[in-house]
Regions:
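Generic structural signal for well-ordered, non-transmembrane alpha-helical segments
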Residues: 239, 264-271, 294, 298-305, ...
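Glycine-rich beta->alpha junctions and the first turn(s) of the following alpha-helix
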Residues: 188-271
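Generic N-terminal amphipathic, Lys/Arg-enriched alpha-helix
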Residues: 1, 9-19
Length: 361
């Protein structure tokens, strides 16, 4: 376990015990954020001067990975909350940060990243889904965010990139569930991770002003936060792969010992990629070279699938018996989510192919 997690709270067993219930949506989804906050996990990688425990963004990646080893649903929620916190840390709007950061760090309130659409917009994959019409110093917002996680029913704040009707540079705003014109849908009918408070947001004639603006220039802000957005997300892949490989090694006895060299090879490559994430964040390489992070994301997703396959092979028929190994069945469907989380593997592969084509032209 990461040293910073050990220093905060070593008792993460609650997430293991409740993993199946949250995956199936059979537990109170609103309890996840307070449980994560109670253990001080949202403070990891946040400057002490702002109420955090210090450290770097990579410490947050490792914290999410530690939770993902126990429950991908909890890690998914953790990613949404911690990523919104990162937006506040990088926003020039100090009043917005001062208002919301304390409650987000403690887990009293939920933060959600609605910037998946913006990240795809940066790559020319899709247009922005919210539109702002200016009225004096304020704007009127309309549109829909079809898939957002950590929309806690007890209350949430969500970041979104907004196209301006006058053609000015898109901006990034923060909306709350209590604002008139902001409506949360019922939970999406997910195959797994059903306790993640994942839903759509409809926005109709919602009034916002300067107090809601995270950044006036989405084209400047989003590339700057993208390394944290993606790297924190990679914590889910890292944690899921680690627990699958560790289980494969534990079960790799007798006739299954033939798998151990392959388990070792995949584990070594996994940790090499983890080191590349750490170094890329520290050097800020991913700001100037996002393609390097895209390639890591793609390879980590492939490693998750390999790790789960090795766990299955090492466990044998036991993996297919619910009364003997429920964790594997849960991890198998959790793993199916890794390739499709935004930006999906096909979207990243398309972006890399487009960049390669541009270089050849």
């Amino acid at each position: 376990m990461n040293a910073r997690i050990d220093a905060v709270d070593a008792d993460l067993s609650w997430f293991s015990i409740n993993a199946e219930a949250y995956n199936l949506g059979a537990a109170d989804a609103d309890q996840l954020v307070p449980e994560l906050g109670r253990r001080g996990l949202f403070r990891i990688g946040v400057p002490q001067s702002l109420g955090g425990d210090g450290g770097a963004t990579f410490d947050g990646v490792e914290a999410i990975a530690a939770i993902a080893e126990r429950s991908l649903t909890a890690a998914f929620v953790f990613w949404g909350q911690r990523t919104f916190i990162e937006y506040l840390l990088q926003s020039p709007n100090t009043q917005l940060r001062e208002r919301w950061l304390p409650a987000l760090l403690t887990g009293e309130f939920a933060g959600a990243t609605g910037l998946s659409n913006a990240m795809k917009f940066l790559s020319g994959i899709e247009s922005l889904q919210l539109r702002a019409t200016q009225h004096g110093a304020r704007w009127e917002l309309d549109g829909r965010l079809p898939w957002v996680t950590n929309l806690r029913k007890a209350g949430f704040i969500v970041a979104a990139a907004v196209e301006r009707s006058d053609g000015a540079t898109p901006m990034v705003v923060a909306l709350t569930d209590s604002q008139q014109g902001v409506a949360r849908s019922a939970d999406l009918d997910l195959v797994a991770l059903r306790g993640s408070n994942t839903a759509a947001i409809d926005v109709s004639v919602a009034d916002i002003g300067p107090e809601h603006v995270l950044h006036e220039d989405a084209r400047s802000f989003c590339p700057g936060v993208r390394p944290a957005f993606l790297s924190l997300q990679l914590g889910m892949s890292i944690g899921l792969a680690r627990v699958a490989l560790r289980t494969a090694a534990q079960h790799g006895q007798g006739a299954h010992r033939i798998l151990l060299p392959r388990v070792g090879e995949v584990s070594a490559e996994l940790e090499q990629l983890v080191g590349a994430v750490r170094d890329g964040l520290a050097s800020r390489r991913f700001v100037a070279e996002p393609a390097a992070l895209f390639r890591i994301r793609i390879r980590l997703a492939e490693i998750v699938q390999s790790a789960l396959g090795l766990e299955l092979d090492a466990s044998g028929g036991r993996a297919y018996l619910r009364d003997q190994n429920r964790d594997f069945a849960r991890r198998w469907v959790e793993g199916a989510f890794i390739p499709v989380i935004t930006p999906s593997l096909t979207q990243l592969q398309g972006e890399l192919a487009k960049q390669a084509g541009a270089c050849k032209a």
